[in-house]
A protein has these predicted regions:
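Glycoside hydrolase catalytic-domain groove-lining segments
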Residues: 83-84, 232-234, 242-315, 325-328, ...
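Bacterial Sec-dependent N-terminal signal peptides
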Residues: 2, 16-42
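Aromatic-rich peripheral "rim/lid" segments of glycoside hydrolase catalytic domains that contact
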Residues: 310-326, 330-388
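Bacterial N-terminal signal peptides that target proteins for export
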Residues: 1-12
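Acidic-and-aromatic substrate-binding clefts and catalytic sites of carbohydrate-active enzymes
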Residues: 58-59, 70-78, 101-113, 191-194, ...
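Hydrophobic faces of well-ordered beta-strands that scaffold small-molecule active sites
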Residues: 48-52, 95-97, 129-133, 182-186, ...
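Boundary/entry segment of secreted carbohydrate-active catalytic domains
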Residues: 40-83
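Substrate-binding cleft and catalytic face of glycoside hydrolase catalytic domains
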Residues: 84-211, 215-234, 240
Length: 388
């Protein structure tokens, strides 16, 4: 999702889609104690999910670096305490976690061990799990798909082997920990390809010769690795800009032999100065229907976020309410995941403070802080449909 910092920066076939939804598109750290419910890995009818990949670092800061964060606990108005209980009370039933190969931070946030720990907590809380492989040491998005530092010397064959090895390693660790993810992304917002330059699709001169075949090979290495560990997991190919017609991308991927079980989209309806949020929501709904109809599979909105400032709260809540009402009625949509809802618009991860980066805080969370407690706003209530 960090693409926000770089970009902040048909219906006639629907009947066919409904009848063919179950045909595979591909063809051929925390310090807070949560009180868990019974673990569950059953398919959810509709995912109201949250990507909380920053939660471990936030909880670490609450204990070890209090000057970096404006609160010491997650709690809601009903008395629920701990991030997962608060999210569950708000209606969240699934958790998404990103995976980096060799994270920059020495604490290893979003590395294998952190992801396994967070996934275990989610499963113990009775939530479904999505794993989001970036195949990078940092955010992979439309502005950057940087090959991990330890992989840069490999050619296509070698990179495919590293994708296989890394995917199996992380998923096998999850399996050993008793976690069975329902969904696995093989790449994050991969509209421009992945693992640049080998898997890059375009440059300033246009489409790169051989780019699609390379990208498909790398993506398929991830797909096959997922199926070798969790055969029933839905493998997602994820791109940005749900408001755009994205059929061209999946046409090209399919033509190159790419495999996927589900399509993933990002939707940030308040980030395009050329469109109103209502227009972006409407376009996203139409495109979800179109993609599902054309490729015979469900669509997951893997990321969503709206502005969290006090002056925007009312309209942001309305935006989320209207989108969730529309998308929930679609049998072709598998669910929606809010990106990092637990932040308050002030806290930011330490890696954002590097001198060559110096990024601001993420301003599309769904929590607020009174200086001691992080609690949900009306945005999370509208998104989850539960109490807060």
């Amino acid at each position: 999702m960090s693409t926000l910092y770089s970009r902040l920066a048909t219906l006639s076939a629907l009947a066919f889609a409904v009848s063919s939804l179950f045909v595979g598109c591909g063809g051929s750290g925390g310090n807070q104690k949560d009180e868990p419910d019974a673990p569950s890995v059953d398919e959810v009818a509709f995912a109201r999910g949250a990507d909380v990949s920053w939660a471990s670092e936030m909880e670490y800061d609450m204990t070890h670096n209090p000057s970096r964060i404006s609160g010491t606990a997650f709690k809601d108005s009903k008395g629920n305490a701990g991030l997962y209980p608060v999210l569950k009370a708000a209606g969240i039933n699934a958790i998404r976690l990103r995976v980096w190969v060799k994270p920059e931070d020495p604490n290893g946030w979003s590395g294998k061990d952190d992801v396994v720990n967070m996934a275990k907590r989610a499963a113990e809380a009775g939530m479904s799990v999505m794993i989001d492989f970036h195949y990078s040491d940092f955010f992979a998005d439309p502005s950057r798909q940087k090959t991990p530092a330890d992989w840069v010397s490999f050619d296509l064959k070698g990179l495919s082997a590293k994708v296989t090895e890394h995917t199996k390693d992380v998923l096998s660790a999850l399996k050993s920990a008793g976690v069975t993810p329902l969904w696995v992304q093989v790449g994050n917002e991969t509209r421009p390809g992945m693992l640049w330059e080998t898997g890059r699709l375009y440059n300033d001169k246009g489409e790169i010769a051989g780019g699609w075949s390379n990208y498909a090979a790398l993506s398929n290495a991830g797909y096959d690795a997922v199926k070798s560990v969790f055969p029933a997991a839905k493998v997602i190919v994820h791109i940005d800009n749900a408001y755009e017609d994205n059929t061209w991308f999946f046409d090209k991927l399919k033509a190159a032999g790419g495999k996927f079980d589900m399509i993933g989209l990002s939707h940030y309806p308040m980030t395009n100065s050329g469109m109103t949020w209502k227009a972006m929501n409407s376009s996203a709904i139409l495109n979800i229907k179109t993609l599902a109809a054309k490729y015979g599979c469900k669509v997951m909105v893997c990321e969503i976020g709206v502005r969290d400032t006090a002056s925007d709260l009312a309209v942001s809540t309305q935006c989320i309410t209207e989108f969730m009402s529309s998308v929930k009625s679609l049998s072709v949509c598998a669910g929606v995941f809010y990106w990092e809802p637990q932040v308050d618009g002030k806290w930011k991860p330490s890696i954002y403070e590097k001198s060559d980066r110096n990024w601001g805080a993420y301003s599309m969370g769904a929590f607020t802080s009174d200086g001691s407690t992080f609690s949900p706003t009306s945005i999370l209530s509208a998104f989850g449909g539960g109490d807060s």
